[in-house]
Amino acid sequence: TLVGFLGTARIHLQIDVGFGDVITPGVQELDYPTLLEFDAPRLLGYTPETTIAEKFQAMVVLDMANTRMKDFLDIWLLAQGRPFSGPVLADAIGATFRRRATDLPTRTPIALTPAFHSTPVKHTQWRAYLRKGRVQGAVPELDVIASRIHAFVMPVVGSLTAGEEFLHRWRPGGPWVPGED
């Protein structure tokens, strides 16, 4: 985390730098939001599809030990807020799991089941994350988030494990519908 000052205002900036990750369909140019009316700096960054793939892969690997509540919120927010091409998301998930030498799940990962999200410990972690992260707006409970992530990610994973193309598109908030954009 970097701390900068604009006058007397303290500004925190966090930058994650990754090496060796596979970015699908490729690096994306992003406009970094500005506080004042200056031109937005252009940065190279991950695609939303790669972000989802990496966070989902962590959910699969970490299993019950997962404490990364931000990953749940991030995937849910992305699925709620933008459309996705099924083939592109499938490519990103497949490439990330291959690169990280992780088998694709053949059944629902524990992180997306009641065995995970209904435990008091996970409920406490979720509430603490929302409070500490100062998450704004109405955010569902972890069980609802997990159910929506399941509806978003698992049809793609099912196609990958079956060796089939996933020729669907996602509208913001879902569900998947047949056809490509």
Question: Where do the model's predicted regions map?
Answer:
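Structured mid-to-C-terminal alpha-helical surface segments
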Residues: 1-181
